[in-house]
Amino acid sequence: MPAEFPDFRLGNVLATSFTATLTERHGDAVERIPTPQRLVDWLAVNGLAVDSCTTAQLELARELRESIHAAATATAIQDALPASAVQVINDCSIQGRAAAILTPEGNRQWRLSSASCVEDALGVIAADAISI
């Protein structure tokens, strides 16, 4: 990964790791997926490898990321979930066609419908957000 980009902040939960691709939201924001290729890199690190990403797909990913952040924040402060965030999360989950497979080692692995389907990867992230 190029040195000019900040390191990814990875955790054990896919959806919250995804929200960590933008940090310092209330200060000098640090964008960790500033380009489509950087989103491809992040997805690969998280087991959701795709061949490429368009600018429109990057924008959809950022919209999903901020929707997950808004829903998680509302949950943390025991507020109502923002309807627009719920809609984006649900839409991304519905549009994705990834399948969970069991590896010989007994682990879950995601199989995307094609290596070019960022929407499948976003569907996995959205489903993870729904589960938490």
Residue ranges with predicted function:
Residues 1-132:
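Short helix-coil boundary/hinge micro-motifs
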